[in-house]
């Protein structure tokens, strides 16, 4: 998926973060004093806005795509504490030891290696600052398809997508080792079922899938293949609605340690 293409505007905006996500993240921040947070790879600003809703005084959304930042600007216009900056995760537009919290949600699977990004995270975080990574492992991705886990049908309908997904997903062991080698202490790791959307009817889910909205993996399918996938999901889901679509994620909560 080309995140810079104007045809993909609003692909990663237009919804709110799940209440369970807000509660989970807030609980991990409860013992920390967070003045400045940065949402790296902020896309359309959904989680930039969520960090502000938690009560963080200053939130910086960073993305390399001007189109995504334009979407984020619209989504975050009511939040005075949000600032948006254009930049790459391997060369963050943040001063050294300037940030108390870095969030990287749905980012690292777009990277060939996490090492340059984790080095930048270590540079920009204050000592004791928190680094929250949210992404899917292969175990998360390849759960069977169901009414809630619609994504599972992608891989049963088109097994070649499994190979594409396998190339871009890092194992939990890899993430843990990369955190350790860059001076982070892993505080907590957990899986999180996050509600993606509540579709009033099956037809609305199928329309959403047809738009490929927020699902970069579907850009690997031709229009004809996408139509086939939509048909497979249509025939697989018996209930008409409402459909509560969820994704399972892995969360890694790490703390920057003092200089070794």
Model-identified regions with their sequence ranges:
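Class I SAM-dependent methyltransferase SAM/SAH-binding core
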Residues: 38, 44-91
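A conserved beta-strand element that flanks and buttresses the S-adenosyl-L-methionine
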Residues: 103
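Short catalytic micro-motifs in class I SAM-dependent methyltransferases
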Residues: 106-107
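A short glycine-rich, Lys/Arg-flanked "PGG" loop and its adjoining helix->strand segment in the class I
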Residues: 115-127
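Conserved Class I S-adenosyl-L-methionine
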Residues: 44, 169-173, 186-260
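Conserved class I S-adenosyl-L-methionine
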Residues: 1-32, 38, 46-50, 68-71, 132-158, ...
């Amino acid at each position: 998926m080309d995140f810079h293409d104007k045809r993909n505007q609003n692909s990663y905006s237009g919804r709110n973060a799940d209440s369970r996500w807000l509660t989970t993240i807030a609980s991990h921040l409860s013992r920390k004093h967070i003045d400045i947070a940065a949402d790296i790879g902020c896309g359309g600003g959904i989680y930039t806005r969520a960090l502000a809703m938690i009560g963080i005084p200053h939130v910086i959304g960073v993305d390399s795509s001007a189109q995504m930042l334009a979407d984020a600007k619209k989504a975050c216009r009511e939040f005075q504490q949000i600032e948006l900056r254009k930049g790459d995760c391997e060369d963050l537009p943040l001063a050294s030891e300037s940030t108390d919290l870095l969030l990287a949600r749905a980012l690292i699977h777009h990277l060939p290696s996490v090492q340059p990004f984790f080095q930048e995270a270590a540079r920009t975080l204050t000592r004791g600052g928190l680094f929250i990574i949210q992404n899917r492992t292969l175990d998360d991705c390849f759960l069977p398809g169901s009414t809630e886990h619609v994504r599972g049908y992608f891989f049963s309908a088109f097994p070649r997508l499994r190979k594409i997904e396998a190339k871009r997903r890092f194992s939990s062991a890899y993430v843990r080792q990369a955190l350790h080698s860059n001076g982070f202490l892993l505080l907590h790791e957990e899986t999180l079922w996050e509600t993606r959307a509540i579709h009033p009817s099956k037809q609305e889910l199928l329309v959403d899938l047809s738009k490929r909205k927020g699902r970069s993996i579907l850009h690997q399918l031709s229009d004809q293949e996408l139509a086939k996938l939509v048909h497979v999901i249509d025939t697989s889901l018996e209930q008409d609605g409402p459909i509560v679509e969820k994704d399972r994620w892995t969360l890694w909560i790490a703390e920057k340690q003092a200089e070794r």
